[in-house]
Amino acid sequence: MSYALALLVAALLLFVPGVAVLWSGGRRGWRAWGAAPPVSIALLLLTGAVGHAAASDAVHGAGAVVLAVLTAAVAGAARLIARPVEDPREPSRPRGRWWPAAAVVFGGAVVATVLGRAVGSATAWPQIHDSIFHVGATTMLVRDGSAWAGDVTAYARVPYPGGWHAVAALVTGLSGADPLTASHALLTVVVSVVWPVGVVLLARTVWGPSPAVLITAAVSAFLCYGLPYQLLTWGVVWPFLLATALLSPVLSQVLELTGLVAVAGGRRRIAAAAALPVVGAAAATVVHPAALYGLAVIGLPAVLERLARAGRHRLAVVVAAGGALAVAAAWSVRPPERLLVAGAAGGGYGALDVVALVLSTVSQHPLSAAVGALAVTAGAVLSVRAGHAWVAVGLVVPLALAASVLVLPHGVVSVLTWPWYSDVNRLRALAVVPSVLAVAAVARYVAGRAGEARALVPWGVPVAVAGLAALTLVTAAPVVSALYHPGTADRWWATPAEQDALASLADRLPRGATVAADPFRGGTFLFLHRDVTLLFPVGDPPLPSRPGAVEVAARLDRVRSDPDVCRAVFASGVTHVLTGGDANADETALGDAYAGLARVGSGTPGFTELARSGPYTLWRVDRCTP
């Protein structure tokens, strides 16, 4: 029941505020629903900012009141200043207008089913250290009554604002669900509704309101493996997934604005239309800055091509020069060192690996991957012929960057690929956005040749889509499931039994305690059950996040016999130690990094046993004098 309520709250938060604003501005149908999520997220982030400024609880009931007031205010302003932009291509009552909506509902159900089958339960933990700080940050926000994205860096070492976590905190507070259940509910809405609805809006903006085009876009959105399924298998990359899903509606608004500029649509109308892409891009960037870089890769070529084809050559030159400077400035930002190495393959792969990379972006099944790749290639060619070469550029550039990560030495490509962590999976997820447009171009071509009635084939399309959906369920669900239910014991970070044991031991800890626990043996999940500080918050080598942390990890058992260790313990403020638990396979690469914790036992001077539960033992560190 808590999951169903969280699902409803997440859907309402992601759509209702945005739809209210857009309807007030004169937008209807896909132009309201498809563009709603970026506007809604902007209002949710603003709600958190207001709560932060007022030092009040913005997560629970007060947050809903603030959101309602902000939505009403912005909707009122939109009603006063908006200049509706009519689409002359759309008839008053297009044939088959409900079919795209049905395709979105069906496709969303397929994606939600894949996720549900893979996860099994809304309280199942993804077995990767990312889940610790993503769900943990949401947990801490809820505990503090904060929905302010800027507070996230106080809880987790993430190099970007916490837009995802702020929204997840609001879903948690307003639904009453636990943070993990609320996060899964938010994830389900993002991949099964936000993503396909945004893609349909983008296809409509580029190719027009043809039902064949919109249905194809909706179906392609849930068939492509690179997004969302590959990202669901890769880890808890939920902020990146949401930011990438927001690219489609933001890009749609950018194209609409460019169209107005190209025909000199009037300053007031242009200024009103500019608000949506600016607000949407800002919201997506707060969720994950990679959205801004993705928008530059796909959107900038689209803007330049559209201006040039409209004869606005001088303006195109100005935009190109400004865009080049902005891109150079954005890519020259010095990122954290770990972003330069996070997902880099380091080179050494061959041509066959690159081919496999491209094909698996479409599907894991060889036959459907080959057919899909042919359709995408044909669509890219048709896009160029139709005056939308930027679709082909937006497809080729991310895949070329992903291929360069495989083929070239890491140091060569990281300068360009660091916004995506030099990770091929994130890069090919970006390529899915233009891929869907390319497939929609094929549908547009076929519909134009055969006519809408024969192109849709009322009986043939449902049968084909159902078959493809079944193939998706068969191929995607087991792969996603491996993230939640590893096949071998050494891939678990914390089994369900270990989670129960940690919850039991957490009750013995005083609030504000600082605990030294091996993250590779499940210890890091402890702070999700209690408001404590962990010396090693995520699954990394024992970095000196606190003074003497490395010394504590390696030689904690010598706290009474080694003055240096005593000083390190005193400086780091460690009050308790957690030992036991099964090791994750990733710990083997670190050698004896956490050996000092493992050696603590009943015969070790300086420690008092407090409790045991399951495979774990909780110890109090007796006071030592440096």
Task: Spell out what each predicted region is.
Residues 108-245, 264, 484-492:
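Active-site lumenal/periplasmic loops and adjacent helix-entry segments of GT-C-fold
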Residues 302-306, 369-396:
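Hydrophobic, aromatic-rich transmembrane alpha-helices
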Residues 318-326, 444-478:
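Signature aromatic-anchored transmembrane alpha helix within multi-pass, membrane-resident enzymes
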Residues 265-289:
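Membrane-interface alpha helices of multi-pass inner-membrane proteins
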Residues 1-93:
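Membrane-embedded, hydrophobic transmembrane alpha-helices
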